[in-house]
Amino acid sequence: VRALITGITGFAGGHLADVLLGRGHQVFGVARDEGAGLQYLNPGISPVIADLQEPAIIEKLLDDIQPDAIYHLAGQAFVPTSWQAPWDTLANNIRPQLNILQAMVNRQSTARLLIVASNQVYGHVETSQMPVSEETSLRPDNPYGVSKVTQDLLGLQYHLSHGLDVIRARPFNHIGPRQSPVFVASSFARQIAWIEAGLSEPVIKVGNLDARRDFTDVIDVMQAYALLVEQGQAGEAYNIGTGQAYSIQYLLEVLLSYTNLSIEVKQEADRMRPADISVIYADNSKLRAATGWEPTISFEDSLRRVLDYWRAEAKSNRK
């Protein structure tokens, strides 16, 4: 299988490349810039540096690579950024998506396209609606969520109107090594690693600890992407999550249990988010029925992987 990954130097992209290589696929990648993620890529992959805002570039990629599968991971992935820069978030997430779909039509591509939406498409869900199935109405409550609804529905539209082979993935929170420290697990783990290395005071800064989220290790999410491309049904949407919700408080406690230091926890107002819902977790039965997918890495082991990554980073920062 010739697989093209957009955003290959991003957090998820590098992990997906490893998963697909492990499945014997030929992997090609495209990235907006060289980026820090380049160092983690398998040396056999040299990504094309290109701007997916340009339609002609995507047509050339399709001509040159002739992919059997396209995993569209590129985009602006952080909810708070979407409050600060809503228009940029919409442009960065919607335009490349539309360009890829239109390029596939123009080039009569029969590739299977995996669109990465998000649990943020569901947005404002009541606790009584848990777990969230793919039938739950889409009520995004931030600009990032709106951009992801648009990507998801553009995929559906091009499947219905042009017969494109599209799968719509709706991953819930994923965590793992190399994730940006703006995300909660990475943020806490990095702070602990920096404190252990003597690079920071023994205080960990946190936001809302009561929120409960469905966290899946990035490797398990990437395996789900690969399985959906192999076995999913064209046009369908699939939730990806463990089906369990863990509080941010518990996430913090697990990470703190991995260190011998005594660390003060300090809640900060600027780490609180507007419109934060208290709990969300996935009904993943559709994904499991279609592919047999099961998560393989426990929440606790996943957090240990994150902390070990930041400990290694702290060591190299101390030199």
Task: Please state what every model-predicted region is.
Residues 2, 299-319:
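Amphipathic terminal alpha-helices
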Residues 42-54:
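Rossmann-fold cofactor-recognition segment
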Residues 52-92:
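NAD(P)H-binding glycine-rich loop region in Rossmannoid oxidoreductase-like domains
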Residues 84-99, 112, 120-168, 175, ...:
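Catalytic helix-loop patch of NAD(P)-dependent Rossmann-fold dehydrogenases
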Residues 203-204, 208, 235-238, 246-253, ...:
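C-terminal "lid/loop" region of Rossmann-like NAD(P)-dependent oxidoreductases
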Residues 221, 225, 240, 251, ...:
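Non-catalytic, hydrophobic alpha-helical segments
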